[in-house]
């Protein structure tokens, strides 16, 4: 790994160093204790848990400012969480996650201590769409609760799952939130048109949200599907209510993501909505 020259000690667990003219952040328990600017470090004399090379000056400045406002105990718990996530089977971009997750947990903890809880309306959608990330996020929250002697609400599992998933999916946090929002509004339309309450544990719900997720991805890549004309006519005639509902949902998606919607897309979404209708008729 070579030699690291300390340029700044952020706290007992984090130091900023240079290595071959590259500024890096070293993280490890007690790594910054009594370390002064100009001191030389190497992995023989200290235990380095993580090395981060933050690419942009904005990332570096933001991370440094975060570390400076967090106490050592909170930061160590965050470091442990990052290590835990990195050691899972998910292919996480640690350089991106270290900044976003540190930022999120520091301020979520501060809000919790001040009894300010932000609700997450997309917990169920996140759980279904990104189940692996959600499972890991739940374990992270359990660790945070135990280490910090607090009780983060389930909303936070959803938020952290999105941070994790955005580092493994080809979507940004913003895009993932938009998709969750579209799915939630779509379910609202279905519940209104079919006069029902959708069971969010049902197979129909899981299939619907998966379909919408991949539908949006395809449309953004300009990948379109085509159904035969006679099939389109048959579905429109057989399931007019479901077709009308699908049309409303896809019109919303069209406006939200500025994409083109074909008649075939409406037909295939109609079939998914019909599954909800069938479930209602069976109950």
Curated annotation (Swiss-Prot):
Every PRD domain range: 69-173, 174-283
Matching entries from SUPFAM superfamilies are given as:
PTS-regulatory domain, PRD, SacY-like RNA-binding domain
Q: What GO molecular-function term can you cite, just one?
A: RNA binding
Q: What InterPro entries would the database entry show? A: BglG_antiterminators, CAT_RNA-bd_dom, CAT_RNA-bd_dom_sf, PRD, PRD_sf, Transcrpt_antitermin_CS
Q: Which cysteines are joined by disulfide bonds?
A: none
Tell me the superkingdom of the source: Bacteria
Q: Name one GO biological process term.
A: positive regulation of DNA-templated transcription
* Keywords on record: Repeat
Give the Pfam families listed for this entry. CAT_RBD (PF03123), PRD (PF00874)
Keyword flag Hydrolase: no
**Signal sequence span per UniProt?**
none
Q: Which family does it belong to?
A: Belongs to the transcriptional antiterminator BglG family. GlcT subfamily.
- Tell me which NCBIfam families the record gives: antiterm_GlcT
* Protein name listed in UniProt: Protein GlcT
UniProt gene name:
glcT
